[in-house]
Amino acid sequence: TDVDDDGWLKTFTIPANGSSITAVASLEFATTDGKYNSLVKLDADTYVNAWQASSSKGKIGTYTIPADGSSITEVTTLVHDGSSITGYNSMITIDANTVLLTYTGESDDGYLKTFAIPADGSTITEKIVLEHDTNYSGFSSVVQVDFDTYALAYRNSNYAGAIKTFDYSLTAATMNPRISTVTIAADNSTIAVTMNEAVY
């Protein structure tokens, strides 16, 4: 977000030793308002950004960025909340084609949403919508705990820090097979691996 509240995406090259930072490509993705951004990587060259757009609408977009960062190409965008949102976006990738977004919506209520996005970023489809706090939810930060559990930290209506956990079993049922936990015995003799589905 620049001095005029316009939204920008930029790429930089940084060598392994961190000795320099070189600007490579840039894209002004929002010429009016592009605030409270949250950017995640969906796959090798597809990125997803959520932000507060003009008229305080909630918007999400996909972008193609090659590994060398030589270009930034907008693929598609979606206004997912047409009301007046406050922002405070926090988004994570939860599966190969799914992102989870938390944000402060209309009347400062707290929302969680999931979106289905194909590998090429050509479409954005809203799937799950949950209003998790009807009083106030600000300064959100969401993390993944395991394959279907997520933890959200935020400021509530009492100006206190709050943490909530969410279990999306419906979403987890459609996820690709993956390791959910790994436990090493005290004597390092065995490793117990638990998958997110039955293994035969």
Predicted feature locations:
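Extracellular, repeat-based ectodomains that mediate carbohydrate processing or recognition
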Residues: 1-172
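Low-complexity, Pro/Thr/Ser/Gly/Ala-rich linker/spacer regions in secreted
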Residues: 168-186
